[in-house]
């Protein structure tokens, strides 16, 4: 099921594919609009697919937090980090950025401290100023 309730299934699918993943979900999802929850689901799915495809031997941490009027999504891996030149961003990352922007949020991607790759999204729960999906 797409949305926050479907995130554990995405994590389990990545685990079955051989990626050790830790999932941490904090806060209540009751305040999260359906479109925002779907965006979070898609970010996690795309980020885990990228880890499986590009990181080599790695582990991953998926952290979703709802609180303080925002939803944050963070996926960090311990893999080899980005191999593309910085000016070549994959279509998946572009799609993530566009969906987050629809809700007035920000997406940051890049090397993780200590190696690997990090995807971080911060999306306001208040839809004021957001563009309808």
Regions found by a protein language model. Give the residues of each.
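Glycine-rich ATP/GTP-binding catalytic cores of kinases/NTPases
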Residues: 1-133
